[in-house]
Amino acid sequence: MVSLLRCPSSKPYSSLICSLTLGAVVALSGVAYAEETKPAETVPVVTPPKVISQPATKNQVRFTKTGAFDSDTVVKIAKRLAAKPYVALKDPLPAGLAKLSYDEYRDIRFNPTASIWRDQGVPFQMQMFHRGFYFQDLIEIAIVEGQNATHLAYEPKYFTAGEVITQALPNDDIGYSGFRIHNQLNTNGVFDELMVFQGASYFRALGKGNAYGLSSRGLALKTADAEGEEFPIFRAFWVERPYNDSNLIVVHALLDSPSVAGAYTFSVRPGDNTLIDVEATLFPRVELSKVGLAPSTSMFLHSLNGRHDTDDFRPEVHDSDGLLMLNGRGEHLWRPLANPRQLQVSAFSDNSPQGFGLIQRERDYASYQDLEAHYERRPSLWIEPVGNWGQGSVVLTEIPTESEIHDNIVSYWKPRQPIPAGSEFHFAYRMSWGEEPAAKVGAVHVSRSASGRADIAKATPRRLFVVDYQIEGPMTDEMPVAKVEASGGVVTNVVIARNAAKNGYRLAFELEPEDKELIELRAELKFPTPRQVETWLYRWTL
């Protein structure tokens, strides 16, 4: 079973490890696919991009050369890069670093006294990550002040090595594998981690009081595709020195892969919900027909709603428990996540989506009982498109996993029309990371859902589903009417009742699958007085 291998968030460098293994999901024996119960589209065959392998010149700076810098600098570099065949850069590490074990890599730590902007009165600090272990790619970094960028060369003085490391750190400019940004997010005078860029185009952030959980990426290409996934990489970063009295830090990034080059700008504002405004320009080398914008990656092992065969003392284990969507029609949709027995892909068609994201709704420690992982503190991530994103689908990929160390959930926006080769494609969106991100939930929203066999006295194929709805504000005397639809099988015994414990209502119904192996479920509540109520969606599989 293959999925995204995670770095446990309790580790000091707080980044994804071995994030490039999702391309091997083709080893899975089957894929369940549905687009709101519609068949998958036929995708034309695309000629693969030309790839050239080129060794690096020692100490060569390719992108972040010291010199003038403005808002168009990275866009121009990306455009020039895309006009040429993709170059698979080779920046070999000294053998000792290339073969580091997990424990050895952890033993190379950034020296906090060497943090960028330390003791300069700046509300942010930056620390770099060493190359080694799984993080072999050379990442260039520059610091921008005013209209000038200065290349940040690797120096061993930035790092300390513990007793596990037996070799001296190199003196050559071998670059970095990424960096993290610190801020006084939780306590004045204490610089806690706020955001991390490391591994391919992965990054993740925290709101106040959060612990690292789900991640995002610059771009998703060919996710869960039979050819294998393509992972673009952020090759270089330009980090603007923040103003002393500002709550904003700006990061520019250069993205590259065999299929596309791109320029990104991340404007980061920490807070209870950390806001990140993303502006991106893509320059495809080939037609991008299997592209995902604003991708998020998370983990779902089990909960009350899925995979009851897991032998675990913890009631629930997940970084996110549902996909929330606010579509172009103003409909709020909640789709609980699942850990399926075979890889499955769902696509929710839309026109001009207003928002979507992977959400961690369950915030009660008692639901997890994990003193180390503290899943109740994992952030949610809400994506708000800027401008009209047109027609397309919110895509959800769920990959089977037997362990919480693997990220097995991916969501993104897939445009209906491919992005042509040789074009210039702009898009923008806002990300909100936090315990209660700026997700526009309905006045009546799902707080919990669970399923089990319908007959507690004997084995039966019939399934019982229970969905709890919570009301924002006081309860009224109104009783809603429930409507439950299924793409197959038979729905029976639909019951709606008040649930004072949740300040809302409980919907219960039974499903007789008959001979079906996959059934799409949809439940709605209708009130006498119109209210904005979340629609509950779920995919039942054998």
Swiss-Prot record:
GO biological process, one term: beta-glucan biosynthetic process
UniProt entry keywords in alphabetical sequence: Periplasm, Signal
Keyword Amino-acid biosynthesis part of the UniProt annotation: no
Top-level taxon of the source organism: Bacteria
Pathway listed: Glycan metabolism; osmoregulated periplasmic glucan (OPG) biosynthesis
Signal peptide per UniProt: 1-34
Family: Belongs to the OpgD/OpgG family.
Protein name, per record: Glucans biosynthesis protein G
Organism: Shewanella baltica (strain OS195)
Gene that encodes the chain: opgG
